[in-house]
From Swiss-Prot:
TM stretches of this protein: none
UniProt KW keywords: Ribonucleoprotein, Ribosomal protein
Gene designation per UniProt: rplQ
Pfam annotation, one family: Ribosomal_L17
Keyword Ribosomal protein: yes
Protein name: Large ribosomal subunit protein bL17
Family: Belongs to the bacterial ribosomal protein bL17 family.
NCBIfam families: L17
Subunit structure: Part of the 50S ribosomal subunit. Contacts protein L32.
One annotated GO biological process: translation
Compositionally biased region (Acidic residues): 172-187
Length: 199
């Protein structure tokens, strides 16, 4: 059973709203971007995105479903020949709403709704970023695994007695030598990372 949409009818009846959305969608597909009031733009967005989803499928049935709403055959042809295939690898989010200054006469909130024309590479970029991060973590973990067993081993009893008998100056020298070896290990890791990135 058909039920009316919730909320206001954009200043008219349900038939007026259907005609209004069809005309706005026709203008959007023809020009790529239109300026309208913000409530109309928000109502147009799901309407237009459903039509683009039909165009992506490209079957005769989908073309007839779109023709029920958009009566201009030229616009339907553009929708199925150009716009639908352009978004073939994108799942939703075909339009963008940008708020602009209010209308001068009645101070109505205005917005520009446009088709998103940029190709998204976020999934490929995220995949590459994750692979680089995994390589860096693996490269950092491998030298640390080799260094950690040396660090975890405690000094032997003879070495402990020798360290206890040495003056404080010798202890400071040992600490400095330890930090130098750590900085050398970090330099080696940085060099290995730069070689991996060069590959």
């Amino acid at each position: 059973m058909p039920k009316p949409t919730k909320g206001p009818r954009l200043g008219g009846s349900s038939s007026h709203q259907k005609a209004l959305l069809a005309n706005l969608a026709t203008a959007l597909f023809e020009h790529g971007r239109i300026k309208t009031t913000e409530p109309k733009a928000r109502a147009l967005r799901p309407y237009a995105e459903k039509l683009i989803t039909h165009a992506k499928k490209g079957t005769l049935h989908n073309r007839r479903e779109v023709m029920k709403k958009i009566r201009d055959k030229d616009i339907v042809h553009v929708l199925f020949a150009e716009i639908g295939p352009f978004y073939s690898d994108r799942n939703g989010g075909y339009t963008r709403i940008i708020k602009v200054e209010n209308r001068k006469g009645d101070n109505a909130p205005m917005a520009v709704i446009e088709l998103v024309r940029e190709k998204t590479v976020t999934s490929e970029a995220n995949r590459a970023r994750r692979a680089d991060a995994a390589q860096k973590v693996a490269a950092a973990a491998a030298p640390q695994a080799a260094v950690e067993p040396e660090v975890t081993e405690g000094p032997s009893a003879d070495e402990a007695e020798a360290v206890a008998e040495t003056p404080i100056a010798d202890e400071a020298q040992v600490e400095v030598e330890g930090t130098e070896s750590v900085s050398e290990a970090e330099a080696d890791e940085a060099k290995a990372d730069s070689e991996d990135e060069a590959k």
